[in-house]
Amino acid sequence: MAAKDVVFGDAARAKMVEGVNILANAVKVTLGPKGRNVVLERSFGGPTVTKDGVSVAKEIELKDKLQNMGAQMVKEVASKTSDNAGDGTTTATVLAQSIVREGMKYVAAGMNPMDLKRGIDKAVAAAVEELKKISKPTTTSKEIAQVGAISANSDESIGARIAEAMDKVGKEGVITVEDGKSLEDELDVVEGMQFDRGYLSPYFINNPEKQVVQLDNPFVLLFDKKISNIRDLLPVLEQVAKAGRPLLIVAEDVEGEALATLVVNNIRGILKTAAVKAPGFGDRRKAMLEDIAILTGGQVIAEEVGLTLEKATLNDLGQAKRVEIGKENTTIIDGAGDARNIEARVKQVRAQIEEATSDYDREKLQERVAKLAGGVAVIKVGAATEVEMKEKKARVEDALHATRAAVEEGIVAGGGVALLRARALISGLKGANADQDAGIKIVLRAMEEPLRQIVTNAGDEASVVVANVIAGKGNYGYNASTGEYGDLVEMGVLDPTKVTRTALQNAASVASLMLTTDCAVAELPKDDAAPAMPGGMGGMGGMDGMM
């Protein structure tokens, strides 16, 4: 086992604070509309240019082990905030640095770190309550666009794209971000439910130009097993043929005689049909078939519920306004399912999301909610170079997370003003003793810091601006991008409540852990001695025997 370096008290804390400051100083230059870029070296390819706090934090690894511990703890603040709220990483880092800096002064003066922590926790809990009270729900598309624009470093076109996407697929719909092929950003919207299974035979294609199968007003047959015997299908096919409407078959597989018969009927124009495999695997396949059934107002024909193919009637089949099937995807548009049943199903899947333990399961469940609730939108990011594309794509993803957070918990005035207003409301808070009061004071001081940093990055005098904003009321604040004072909500400078709340909670959590640290254990660097010179090869005598 490697030897350890054990450092106690102020010496340990001082080294960790140095690490905190190195990381926080690198991250905080990116804060606000006039924040600067940070260039990150890559081991291969060109460097990455970013204004995203968490991307900068993740790159920082310090040589000194104790400094690195401090830096890694603040990196955790940025990562946690990014994971929970999707934005606010730089704000969280600035808050954490301030709480650590102020807190260390009190610890050095001999105050009890545990009481300081209790005071900090009390102040943060009170501030979060006040933030929730001053928060207002996002109601308009314009507000969503403004939140997106602020999070994307004041890029209004990104905010507008996200608002447009949310308009089209609903606030529950899935919005994904991909690399575009042109210089402009594009928005592709897939309405209805789309799943990644295409036609089982190209002979079903009835639109040769687009190479797709289009079925108008079809019945939808859902079966959870393989279909290989046409006899099982005949009763349903006859009923559908009498109704004179097309049929989409979604089953585990359709093969052999059954597939051949469907193809022949299709070519001869006797019955317009198409067959696709059911999406997913195992239990997920059953769940997705059930989703399609609820969306189309049909039933999954399964032996478990006492239904068989031979006895299936038109009442068991789902219906849709249109179905489009490509080589790799099937889209069901405007299913005939009951809106109440769909809503109940969405609630049920949401409950499963709450209980899901793995990120993969959660992501798949969220996709199912989106497919049931609205649709899928894809924002294709356009840029001139790959470096610009990466940077812009990261900003679009940030903005997307921020708008989701705004929809979830509402919005507050941006530009660090919400924290100042919450601070004013809790300024009378008292702890159980003087040390707890000092903990409360630490948080009150830290809540000014984001505004100070935004103003500093904009090149103005922080103390003057903070004093002016404190003198104002409500949403009155400083718009750093224009250099004007006024109602920030009207100016469109908004922050999601969830982002501001999460930043404060995570910063206080990690910073107070650091204040209560009294010993740090780090590995000592190993002295790797240079390897010895290799000896000559044995058995090589003189050259006498060669004569």
UniProtKB/Swiss-Prot annotation:
Keyword annotations: ATP-binding, Chaperone, Cytoplasm, Isomerase, Nucleotide-binding
Record GO cellular component, one term: cytoplasm
InterPro entries in the cross-refs: Chaperonin_Cpn60_CS (IPR018370), Cpn60/GroEL (IPR001844), Cpn60/GroEL/TCP-1 (IPR002423), GroEL-like_apical_dom_sf (IPR027409), GROEL-like_equatorial_sf (IPR027413), TCP-1-like_intermed_sf (IPR027410)
Gene3D superfamilies per record: GroEL, GroEL-like equatorial domain, TCP-1-like chaperonin intermediate domain
Main location: cytoplasm
GO process terms (BP): protein refolding
Cellular compartment(s): Cytoplasm
Gene Ontology MF annotations: ATP binding; ATP-dependent protein folding chaperone; isomerase activity; unfolded protein binding
Domain of life from the UniProt record: Bacteria
Catalytic reaction(s) noted: ATP + H2O + a folded polypeptide = ADP + phosphate + an unfolded polypeptide
Name of one Pfam family that matches: Cpn60_TCP1
Binding-site positions, ATP: T30, L31, G32, P33, K51, D87, G88, T89, T90, T91, G415, D495
EC number: 5.6.1.7
Coiled-coil segments on the chain, per record: none
Family per record: Belongs to the chaperonin (HSP60) family.
NCBIfam families associated with the record: GroEL (TIGR02348), PRK00013.1 (NF000592), PRK12849.1 (NF009487), PRK12850.1 (NF009488), PRK12851.1 (NF009489)
Quaternary structure, from the entry: Forms a cylinder of 14 subunits composed of two heptameric rings stacked back-to-back. Interacts with the co-chaperonin GroES.
General function of this protein: Together with its co-chaperonin GroES, plays an essential role in assisting protein folding. The GroEL-GroES system forms a nano-cage that allows encapsulation of the non-native substrate proteins and provides a physical environment optimized to promote and accelerate protein folding.
Protein name: Chaperonin GroEL
Organism per entry: Ralstonia nicotianae (strain ATCC BAA-1114 / GMI1000) (Ralstonia solanacearum)
